[in-house]
């Protein structure tokens, strides 16, 4: 008997499982708001220099730019006498008296004047937020192994609620950035624990469906954010609105049970048995739960216990040539996906289309993208799907370089297509990486992969700063990186209908150029298949 069969005995997909997935899914729905929040809280409105004291408005004060609109960062030097020389002979100066913003909505940009020479601080704030997700994954992943999944989940809810609320009351920009960093740490802890607890408590046959449902919670969250931002024009109130629900999630998380596998592996089998019996009673199978014994539970988790005792590190990912090649190619694919994804997801403002409508479109494209991904993974395979997703995304981003700014519709279509391809890439990578790495080192491999996508998402906003040198440079960098990631995926083996490797030595028996996938009995395939997890970019394993 396996743990899956024990799960069947206590209710399989009963009331507990549906409530469990719902409790885990609601925070994910709201987590998308935090992840993409700076699209609206850091929006940069049209602006120009504030007039000097006692100066009258007019073209003799604010010069006109090449586009026929007032310059955003320069003004004419105001003469001390009443005479006004010819515009072509006048010198210009920075906005010494601040700026005037043509918007009824406020943001961190308008409050702290993050424009002109200070506009780099806006991108830096997003990078520091992403750095929080990166550091949180490294620190909280280790703490989760030591103290359990549920305590980390509960503390992460509280951390995100408190730091998000703190950001809403930040008196200065540096304080705001610190709180956003802590928000990133909280998001990482929520992601890590949610994925593990969702997969563990759902039977094998339902994991793909429930994982898909949980993934779509993130997608739905992308629809909610524009509505909230439109209804709440003040960035502080918007920040507070998306943070307060996590205080409620903090309280509800006390109902969430701990990972049974973690309890058994850490010598807390008695507590694990009590939880299983509680779940059985909740599902109307109290008698089945009472018949479970400690010896039976330990016996059926003996394999997990044995694997846990075998300690592997990131260095083992480079032990044999095939594993080294896989790790390099997967790392590049993960980096490219995170790097390019956030170039589009956080660049909604650049396409000259209504910010709220475009964000809804950007969120909506994930729905068909993930559905097409599921079909492609099942019929074309992981290798083809992964390579195609990144290559097409890279091509779309590079094409943006050659489309004039006035062709807004064409640029928007390319951006939406590219974002859909990158969403597809994320969905594929979660499954593909899990299938490629052997069981004994799978968690380590997923952790390293997650690290690289966080590095990519952290560097992505900083690359936008290169646009001040030449506007086309960022898209060139994003596009080429995506193409490199897609090219790297071409060197990975196909895993469709292949048995999952248990040990590192099993990889040495794999043929890199196997043309015909081995057909297996459906029952055997179901027991080996790792479910597709078409989550958002921040719902991966760590």
Curated annotation (Swiss-Prot):
Residues of the signal peptide: none
Glycosylated residues, per the record, are 86, 102
One Pfam family named in its UniProt record: Sugar_tr
Q: Which GO terms describe its cellular component?
A: apical plasma membrane; basolateral plasma membrane
Show the Gene3D superfamilies listed in the entry: MFS general substrate transporter like domains
Among the GO biological process terms of this entry, one is: response to toxic substance
Ranges of compositional bias, category Basic and acidic residues:
514-527
Q: Where does the protein principally reside?
A: membrane
Top-rank taxon: Eukaryota
Q: Which residues carry this modification: Phosphoserine?
A: 4
Q: Which residues lie on this side of the membrane: Cytoplasmic?
A: 1-20, 145-158, 202-212, 258-327, 376-386, 433-471
GO MF terms, alphabetically ordered: antiporter activity; organic anion transmembrane transporter activity; xenobiotic transmembrane transporter activity
Q: Which residues cross the membrane?
A: 21-41, 124-144, 159-179, 181-201, 213-233, 237-257, 328-348, 355-375, 387-407, 412-432, 472-492
Tissues expressing the protein: Expressed (at protein level) in the kidney.
Q: Catalytic activity annotated for this protein?
A: estrone 3-sulfate(out) + glutarate(in) = estrone 3-sulfate(in) + glutarate(out); estrone 3-sulfate(in) + 2-oxoglutarate(out) = estrone 3-sulfate(out) + 2-oxoglutarate(in); glutarate(in) + 2-oxoglutarate(out) = glutarate(out) + 2-oxoglutarate(in); urate(in) + 2-oxoglutarate(out) = urate(out) + 2-oxoglutarate(in)
Q: Which InterPro entries match?
A: MFS_dom, MFS_sugar_transport-like, MFS_trans_sf, Orgcat_transp/SVOP, Sugar_transporter_CS
Positions of the region Disordered? 514-542
Compartment annotation: Basolateral cell membrane
- Side of membrane Extracellular, spans: 42-123, 180, 234-236, 349-354, 408-411, 493-542
Family matches, as PANTHER family = SOLUTE CARRIER FAMILY 22 MEMBER (PTHR24064)
Q: Which NCBIfam families match?
A: 2A0119 (TIGR00898)
Tell me the function of this protein.
Functions as an organic anion/dicarboxylate exchanger that couples organic anion uptake indirectly to the sodium gradient. Transports organic anions such as estrone 3-sulfate (E1S) and urate in exchange for dicarboxylates such as glutarate or ketoglutarate (2-oxoglutarate). Plays an important role in the excretion of endogenous and exogenous organic anions, especially from the kidney and the brain. E1S transport is pH- and chloride-dependent and may also involve E1S/cGMP exchange.
Concerning its family, UniProt says: Belongs to the major facilitator (TC 2.A.1) superfamily. Organic cation transporter (TC 2.A.1.19) family.
Q: What is this protein called?
A: Organic anion transporter 3
